[in-house]
Design a protein with these regions (language model features):
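Beta-rich interaction/scaffold domains
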Residues: 1-33
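Beta-strand-rich domains and repeat architectures in extracellular enzymes and scaffolds
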Residues: 43-77
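Repeated scaffold domains used in trafficking and secretory/extracellular systems
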Residues: 50-61, 97-111, 143-163, 202-221, ...
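Blade-loop segments of beta-propeller domains
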Residues: 83-120
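Asp-box/WD-like beta-propeller blade repeats and closely related beta-sheet repeat scaffolds
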Residues: 119-178
Length: 287
């Protein structure tokens, strides 16, 4: 703890007051965040800032440093990044060899590394690129021939640090002819990327194409880690046992009609100050 005195003299040159200034590390709670400390930083109208909503949109977010990345996934709009504290636009994300037309979504890991995923119908090539900065051209992390019988690329999640230990999950979207209860997962262990695993989830029914699909998010960085999902229009938050992939309802009341016209498919998990958090954003399905 360091302290010093500061004397302030008034405009009359006589009146004065001495203050003691101390530099110290504040006390920190041992678990999670302090309830009531939430602060709304900004509120943006997407149309006003040049990100209009269309039926082709499949939006996703990423965070790297103090940069908030917004990717519309519409095939035409270059992802942009904003000051995460003020909401002011800074610039467009450097994509390098990744084309806007192929880009499906973006996400980020616990260390601020960004993943960019391409769209892939059944039988086509699905790619994940990585970068450590919004201004550094991404490099290829992996390519996978999509043999799931479904579409991929609109929702990808990551838990952990892709340079050490992480779990990457790409949702398989439903199509016009088939619903989906599958995702593809990659496990990174000690910086080494493992083989893709196609996983079928038991007891969740079937989700559809965007915007009726789900983002599958996991608690940990192993193949046995439990995970969560929720999709329109059942809007049920499922907790899934990572060992047997059997689902249980985490919010049973959401299937009694109370969630009509809502779309509860925006979710993520994060660790903070020794606590694990699940975030579920409940939005209106109809404009």
């Amino acid at each position: 703890r360091v302290s010093s005195d500061l004397t302030v003299i008034a405009h009359d040159g006589v009146t004065k007051q001495t203050y003691t200034i101390q530099k110290a590390v504040p006390d920190k709670i041992p678990y999670g965040y302090r309830k009531g400390s939430e602060t709304e930083l900004f509120k943006l109208d997407m149309g006003v800032i040049g990100l209009p909503w269309t039926g082709a949109n499949a939006p996703s977010l990423a965070v790297s440093g103090n940069n908030l990345v917004v990717c519309l996934g519409d095939g035409t709009t270059t992802p942009a990044y904003y000051n995460a504290s003020t909401g002011n636009k800074i610039g467009n994300v450097t994509l390098g060899s990744v084309s806007v037309a192929s880009l499906g979504c973006m996400t980020s890991d616990s260390r601020g590394n960004i993943l960019l995923a391409t769209k892939a119908t059944n039988g086509k090539s699905f790619s994940i690129y990585k970068t450590s900065s919004v201004t550094t051209a991404p490099t290829l992390l992996t390519t996978y021939t999509n043999n799931t019988g479904l579409d991929m690329g609109t929702k990808v999640s990551v838990q952990g640090d892709i340079n050490t230990n992480a779990s990457i999950i790409a949702t398989c979207d439903g199509t016009a002819s088939s619903g989906s209860n599958k995702f593809v997962r990659w496990i990174i262990t000690d910086g080494v990327l493992g083989s893709p695993q196609v996983v079928t989830v038991n007891g969740v029914g079937n989700w559809g194409a965007p915007a009726s699909n789900t983002k599958v998010v996991t608690k940990g960085t192993t193949a046995q880690s439990d995970y969560f999902l929720s999709y329109y229009d059942s809007n049920i938050l499922y907790w899934v046992n990572g060992t047997n992939n059997n689902a249980s309802k985490s919010l049973e009341d959401s299937d009694n009609g109370n969630s009509w016209a809502m779309n509860n498919n925006c979710l993520d998990t994060r660790s903070f100050n020794n606590a694990q958090y699940l975030v579920l954003v409940c939005t209106a399905h109809f404009p």
